Amino acid sequence: MLQKLKCNKNGDFTVLVVADPQCEKEFQWKEAADELEILLKKEEPDFVLINGDMETNNLITKENWGIFIQPIIERKIFWSTVNGNHDPFKKEINDMYLEFDKCLNTIIENERPLNYCIPVLGSKEEKTVFAIYGMDSGDAFIDDGWTGYTKKQLEWYRNCSEELKTENNGVSVTSMMCCHIPLQEVVSMEILHGVCNENMGRTSKALNVGTFEAIKEQGDVKILVFGHSHKINVIGKLDGILMGYAGKISSGSYHDEFSRGGRIVKFNENEPNKVVTYWSGVLPTSKDQPAVVI
């Protein structure tokens, strides 16, 4: 477990998820910072998660990363990262992230190291009321999709979920889960809002270890948020669980003018079984989406 966050005096906690800056040039890092600034001013999140694919060749410099996250640092907001297919785990890069203030990345002993659970405390007591899972979803393409979660990762998630449940007197702790590569099940969800201007890259069906079924069984994760697809910002629902895309931040790599922005997830401790999500754009052509409640 990591340092714990806290709901505000009204019981609210807001998460901003952005993804895929995939910057290669300094002007793109500055552009990503400008778009992040827009989102932070607009949404005032308590926590920011950057959901993979920071730089195409996984060669991020401390200088460029500092440009990108300066708006977060200035506001003293806690933040973390998730590995994407373009940035498989490198200890030296994770160590660089940790040199910046308020970074909550950690390493779990696992086949792929960067998985973590960040608890969020209630406003008035030392009790976990919400949790944020960050998961490594693999970097290799196999036949019909990406490698996705491993069995060891799934076992870790189950154990962590059960630990939180035990601490909460046998009641599951409402949670969100972020990973870069979408689960295979996105093709089956009912799309509620958003644009989808490319094929939905996802976990290989052959390598699917049953992540979605495990999440249904645990009953704690209400929403999964993905990256990877730069021209998709949809939100959908399957079997009572929301699955949404973060869209893209910056013009790094391929992009369009409709999915530039980030996904917001809101929780309130006074309604502990509910989450609210919507997508927030940074360009005039990237239209905000209506809120979805589950």
Task: Please give the residue ranges for each predicted region.
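N-terminal active-site segment of His-dependent metallophosphoesterases
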Residues: 1-67
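Extended active-site neighborhood of metal-dependent phosphoesterases/phosphodiesterases
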Residues: 2-7, 65-170, 263-268
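Binuclear metal-dependent phosphoesterase catalytic core
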Residues: 2-5, 9, 18, 115-126, ...
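Active-site environment of divalent metal-dependent phosphoester hydrolases
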Residues: 24-26, 56-59, 81-92, 140-143, ...
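Metal-dependent catalytic neighborhoods of phosphoester/phosphodiester hydrolases
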Residues: 28, 52-71, 88-106, 189, ...
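Soluble or luminal CAZymes and related metallo-dependent hydrolases
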Residues: 28-32, 60, 64, 110, ...
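His/acidic metal-ligating clusters that form di-metal
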Residues: 43-47, 131-133, 145-233
